[in-house]
């Protein structure tokens, strides 16, 4: 999320679809839907915590929204789940150059893995929509690992699946704490993907500003 594609772009469309459903079925305004969604997220975080993939489960979030709205769970929880995710995925747009970058890596026999905080099913759907599945050799989700990034166990599984030493792995991500610092602390080379932000003060990370036009041979040195 936010490395291969823009999460915010798709999330905006997903929330519009969810708000449309809630307005049509319950007479709830877009603003009320947004506020209820945020309240449900806060409640679920309090119950589940922030270190497990279950925190991302939108079905449970929709369930909590319906409880707050005092509306029936059936059939609305699943309908709201699909209203959000189906629209979200329909509007996924890959970040410029990512497909070409992966293609060039595969030409050079580089194994490509996906390391992501989220439930597996949704991430599989996203990857199919982005169009990168033919380049991917393995996937590690926080649902499989049982912990979220930056926990070392998550990165240990990434290294295990890559089949090489940690120092031979590059982990590209957009989140400094979860992706980059987590990778370096586990012995991998963390590479920060950021289009606008600057690294934290007194910290330096290898940085990718755009996947378009990357010199792959130079990148692999």
What are these regions (language model features)?
Residues 1-96:
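N-terminal helical cap/lid subdomain that shapes the substrate entry/recognition surface
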Residues 9, 24, 28-31, 75, ...:
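Asp-based, Mg2+/Mn2+-dependent phosphohydrolase catalytic module
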Residues 67-70, 108, 203-204:
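Short glycine/proline-enriched coil/turn segments at helix->beta-strand junctions
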């Amino acid at each position: 999320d936010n490395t291969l594609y823009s999460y915010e772009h798709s999330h905006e469309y997903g929330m519009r679809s969810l708000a449309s459903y809630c307005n049509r079925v319950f007479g709830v305004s877009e603003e009320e839907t947004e506020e209820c969604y945020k309240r449900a997220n806060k409640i679920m975080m309090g119950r589940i915590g922030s270190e497990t993939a279950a925190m991302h489960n939108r079905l449970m979030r929709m369930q909590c929204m319906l409880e707050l709205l005092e509306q029936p769970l059936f059939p609305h929880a699943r309908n709201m789940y699909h209203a959000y995710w189906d629209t979200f995925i329909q509007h996924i747009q890959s970040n410029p150059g990512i497909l070409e970058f992966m293609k060039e890596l595969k030409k050079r026999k580089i194994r490509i893995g996906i390391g992501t905080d989220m439930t597996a099913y949704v991430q599989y759907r996203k990857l199919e929509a982005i169009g990168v599945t033919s380049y991917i050799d393995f996937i590690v989700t926080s649902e499989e690992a049982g912990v979220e990034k930056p926990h070392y166990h998550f990165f240990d599984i990434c290294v295990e699946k890559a089949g090489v030493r940690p120092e031979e792995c590059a982990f590209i991500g957009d989140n400094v704490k979860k992706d980059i610092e987590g990778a370096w602390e586990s012995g991998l080379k963390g590479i920060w993907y950021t289009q606008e932000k600057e690294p934290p003060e007194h910290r330096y990370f290898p940085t990718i500003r755009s996947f378009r036009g990357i010199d792959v041979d130079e990148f692999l040195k």
